[in-house]
Amino acid sequence: MSLRFAYFYLMADDPDRVRATVPRHVAHWHGLGLTGYLGGPFADRTGGLITFQADDDQQAQHAVDTDPFVQEGLLKAYWLKQWTPE
């Protein structure tokens, strides 16, 4: 049984590097082929939210750890939480 996760992140103040990394970030998440993927930036572009399903906490954490935004140090903060929508 898969679990649902929410990945909430806030961008660092480096708009040029963020803009240059967006295509790799999007390709990363689409390339994972995760069930239930839904994601995108906040309207003010200060961060974003991604929801998805994973088999366990480790699979979800790996998806976040390999996100180019994380690897390039472009996030001020981020949270990964199991999510139970009602």
Predicted regions mapped to residue ranges:
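Conserved, structured core segments of small domains
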Residues: 1-86
